[in-house]
Structures are given as structure tokens and as C-alpha cells.
Amino acid sequence: MSAVAPDGRKMLRLEVRNSQTPIERKPEWIKTRAKMGPEYTKMQNLVKSEGLHTVCQEAGCPNIYECWEDREATFLIGGDQCTRRCDFCQIDTGKPEALDRDEPRRVGESVVTMDLNYATITGVARDDLPDGGAWLYAETVRQIHEQTAGREAGRTKVELLAPDFNAVPELLREVFESRPEVFAHNVETVPRIFKRIRPGFRYERSLKVITDARDFGLVTKSNLILGMGETREEISEALKQLHEAGCELITITQYLRPSVRHHPVERWVKPQEFVELKEEAEQIGFSGVMSGPLVRSSYRAGRLYGMAMEQRRSATV
């Protein structure tokens, strides 16, 4: 009898193999404290009363208290089905719904309603679309910028966490021309295990996307997830390669397994190693680094953007 995933489909062989390893027990340092400040409480009430949806609350992000206190939030676009499968990601792989061309406008309205200082837009890969979803990502940035142009506290800044669009120059250009304050593309892991963890992507292609974004003049960002089988030396090498590719901002985090169908946790990285990696990344030359067990790629995103801009200003003096 074939193993069946929760969504009713037949499980992939990789998922069956992953399922043979029970969910790992988290160490004591993988925990967070709820610090509900006044801005967080306002945001929580607003999201509930207006029926808004953010990745922050729907994914149970441990950093929601800090981010919402800073009036920062993350939105997922493109639907809930991805055309690629990464072995760490909880988003389902399958055939997406038809493109919702009104979604960018609605996301913009949500940003206005929440009065955000900084919005991170992420989404699924849409290889089913002729443009890979490039218009959708670009239009969402445009809508947020247009709808918040008259905001008293200043236009909402947008960070776009995008797929690679197969590194097609025309598609990347369309996205870049929407001028997000930050263009993020996450490599997530090191070259040796990249194909196993992210079979739909290519490491060198991801580096090229980051280089192209930097050459276009955008602030660039990426993320590394630790605990999926990489070595300490490989992390250091990946950091150097990312910086050489033009990456300015980096987040480094611990892999937390979403379910038994996903890649097992190979190791729990101790807090001290995250401290050491932060220092190493800063020495390599990254403008801003967030490194810790519960850091996520959108964690303190506005603060990291500020670090990049400060570094750029210093370089021109």
C-alpha cells in the first residue's frame, strides 16, 4: 500500500525515506518568549478585525512579536501550491490555481490598512506561467509603493523574497524595475547538498540572480539554513561565495523540520556558533547580519535594510 501525504496525494520516495526518521526533540535554546508591546497588540487586533492574512501569524513565526512591534509583516503571493519542491519547505508542491491578477492590489490594501513601515513579499515558484510569475512579483511591489505614497510616516519599504525566474534576463529585469528596497533570493544551503535539498534550483544560478540584482543597483540579501547536513567549513565557503556574488545582507538560521515528510534535522547548531558566524560574516564584509536559531529571513528586515543603506552612504563619503 502506497504511503499517502496529508493532502491526499501519494508520497514521494524521498518523503517516504524522510518519514522513517521521527521528528527530533528540540534543544532547550530553541524557544521564544512572547513580548506583546503596544504596537503588536494594535496589529493583532487590526489583522483579526479586518480579516487580513500574513505569513507571520499563519506560519506561527516565533518573531512575530518583535516584527509587528516594528510594524513589519510578511505576505505570501502566488497561491499555496509551488511548482518546485524543497526538502525543508512546508509549502505544498502541486499544480497552482490560475493567476489571481487582483492579488497585488489586495496586498497593497492590507499594507495600507496595517500602516506598515516595511513589508516583505515572498511567494511560490510559478513555473506554470510563461513569465514565471515575474509580473505578479513586480506588480505587488508597484502596488505597495503606489498605495502608500502619501503615508504620513513615509512610503512603505518593500523587500521582495523571490524565486530565480530561471535567471531569464527579461524576467529578472521586469522584477528589478519595480524597484523593491531589497531584493532577496535565498540559496538556503551549501553546494554539496544543494541539489538534494533544492532539486528545482541551481546554486550557481542563484548566485547569478543575486549578482544581477546587485548590478542593477538593488540592495541584495540571502539566507542560509543550518542543520541539513552541511559542515562548518562549507558554511564559511558559502558565505564567501555569496559576498563575492554581490550579496550585502545575510540571515543565518537553524533548520526546524515542518513534518516527518521533510528532511531530518542533521544537527542542532549551538547559540555560540551562530555568534561566531555573525562575526565571521561581518569580517567577510556583509553590511548586515542576523544570525541565530530562531532568526528567519524576514527577521528585523527593516533594520538590516538600514544597515545596508548606511554602508552605502559611508562608501560614497
Curated annotation (Swiss-Prot):
Pathway(s) this gene product operates in, as recorded in its UniProt entry: Protein modification; protein lipoylation via endogenous pathway; protein N(6)-(lipoyl)lysine from octanoyl-[acyl-carrier-protein]: step 2/2
Residues annotated for [4Fe-4S] cluster 2 binding in this entry: C82, C86, C89
Cellular compartments per GO CC: cytoplasm
Annotated catalysed reactions: [[Fe-S] cluster scaffold protein carrying a second [4Fe-4S](2+) cluster] + N(6)-octanoyl-L-lysyl-[protein] + 2 oxidized [2Fe-2S]-[ferredoxin] + 2 S-adenosyl-L-methionine + 4 H(+) = [[Fe-S] cluster scaffold protein] + N(6)-[(R)-dihydrolipoyl]-L-lysyl-[protein] + 4 Fe(3+) + 2 hydrogen sulfide + 2 5'-deoxyadenosine + 2 L-methionine + 2 reduced [2Fe-2S]-[ferredoxin]
Signal peptide: none
Keyword set includes Lyase: no
EC number(s) per entry: 2.8.1.8
Annotated Radical SAM core domain residues: 68-287
UniProt cofactor(s): [4Fe-4S] cluster
Keyword tags: 4Fe-4S, Cytoplasm, Iron, Iron-sulfur, Metal-binding, S-adenosyl-L-methionine, Transferase
Main location class: cytoplasm
Binding site for [4Fe-4S] cluster 1: C56, C61, C67, S298
UniProt-recorded Gene Ontology molecular function terms: 4 iron, 4 sulfur cluster binding; lipoate synthase activity; metal ion binding
Pfam families: LIAS_N, Radical_SAM
Subcellular location: Cytoplasm
Top-level taxon of origin: Bacteria
Cofactor note: Binds 2 [4Fe-4S] clusters per subunit. One cluster is coordinated with 3 cysteines and an exchangeable S-adenosyl-L-methionine.
Family under the similarity heading: Belongs to the radical SAM superfamily. Lipoyl synthase family.
HAMAP family noted in UniProt: Lipoyl_synth
Name this polypeptide is given: Lipoyl synthase
Name of the encoding gene: lipA
